Amino acid sequence: MKRTKSIHHASFRKSWSARHLTPVALAVTAVFMLAGCEKSDDTVSLYQNADDCSAANPGKSAECTTAYNNALKEAERTAPKYATREDCVAEFGEGQCQQAPAQAGMAPENQAQAQQSSGSFWMPLMAGYMMGRLMGGGAGFAQQPLFSSKNPASPAYGKYTDAAGKNYGAAQPGRTMTVPKTAMAPKPATTTTVTRGGFGESVAKQSTMQRSAAGTSTRSMGG
């Protein structure tokens, strides 16, 4: 009898714990999940230039101009660099490349190497930029330069991509989208020249990773 009574008590304690602790655990988990979502995403707008931004944000012309100019400077620092104009044009299309400033992120030995081959090095024009609120709730804006290819053979053709090759959809300014906060973080400076087709390979790899991540997320949500 004592043994049976003991078993009943143990069963009662287990049942009580399951009833009373599980909802608390679930609630705590939900709070952390919501907090994680709030910290991981940012809403940004995509513009081609400062005029597009000003038209969409009356009264914010100064902020739009500042963000655009900062994006241009960031593009000079982080855009893929090519030793020759031909390599850049093969990747981004005719009329989409420019000579990069001498100190645009390149290490001295790489500058010398590029300049020996073509007199300078080349980079794609900034096709647009993302603009969002500063991390931490600051009053200013964060920006990220975007690039796009006019060469149909390139994986970046008709798309907005950042300096790392991540794809943000069709190269259509005026859109608003949600991106991870890491998307607006400064990218590392370009310190070496890219071989012909190298940036396109990066875009293709990033697109594959994005599709894989999206598929994993969908399967997880669906059980």
From Swiss-Prot:
Region (Disordered): 178-223
Compositional bias per record (Polar residues), positions renumbered to this chain: 204-223
Composition bias type Low complexity, residue spans: 178-195
Family designation: Belongs to the UPF0441 family.
Designated name of the protein: UPF0441 protein YgiB
Species for this entry: Salmonella enteritidis PT4 (strain P125109)
